Amino acid sequence: MKTSKTASESGINLEIIFAGRSNVGKSSLLKELFGAKVRVGKRPGVTLRPTHAQVSDLLITDMPGFGFMSGVKERKQDIVKDKTVHYIEDNAGRIKIAVLVIDGPAFPEIVDRWDSRDQIPIDVEMFDFLREIGIDTIVAANKMDKVKENESDPLLNEVAIRLGLEPPWQNWKHIIAPISAKKGDLKTLKGLLRDRLHEMKRDDLFKYI
């Protein structure tokens, strides 16, 4: 599968983007989700621009990690965030699905820390932005293997609350997908992606997901 920084855009009818902080396991998720079927390139160092893979008329885009990035100045972090927003705005017509990857166990604490400074956490800001411009958004709550089974539902309720969604989280199973990329547990996310492709009458793309 051919990948490039600026994938050939001929014949693209729909796009799925993957976004998230730089330390939430997004690259592991992409590798586990698509494997050898679709190579979404991970260039050495910090990814500062989108990376693409095209299959059929579907473009899969790995957005640069936003927020704190080791060894990257704050000004450049802001530029990455702005470029990400501009990319999404410019391509909103063809971006049919966005997968926002979060660190599930750490998410409530991260949001509360930002709230205590009277700042909107970038994950929440991105979630609201994607929904405001009409992009169907899935929140992949990664690293759930670190959470005990009896603590999973209470944690996911807290995740829902921080996203502005009324708990219980089970009311939002079409949006929140608890996963563990490291353990290869992506069943819920795959199911939600396929549900959406089915609604678009694009079952032909199931073989890539």
Curated annotation (Swiss-Prot):
Similarity comment: Belongs to the TRAFAC class TrmE-Era-EngA-EngB-Septin-like GTPase superfamily. EngB GTPase family.
Organism name: Methanosarcina mazei (strain ATCC BAA-159 / DSM 3647 / Goe1 / Go1 / JCM 11833 / OCM 88)
NCBIfam families, alphabetized: PRK04213.1
Domain EngB-type G: 12-203
PROSITE patterns xrefs: G_ENGB (PS51706)
Family annotation (HAMAP family): GTPase_EngB
SUPFAM superfamilies: P-loop containing nucleoside triphosphate hydrolases (SSF52540)
Function text: Necessary for normal cell division and for the maintenance of normal septation.
Pfam families: MMR_HSR1
Name of the protein in question: Probable GTP-binding protein EngB
Binding site for GTP: 20-27, 45-49, 62-65, 142-145, 179-181
Record keyword GTP-binding present: yes
Gene3D superfamilies, A to Z: P-loop containing nucleotide triphosphate hydrolases (3.40.50.300)
Binding-site list for Mg(2+): 27, 47
Cofactors required: Mg(2+)
Source organism superkingdom: Archaea
GO molecular function: GTP binding; metal ion binding
Keyword annotations: Cell cycle, Cell division, GTP-binding, Magnesium, Metal-binding, Nucleotide-binding, Septation
GO term, biological process aspect, one: cell division
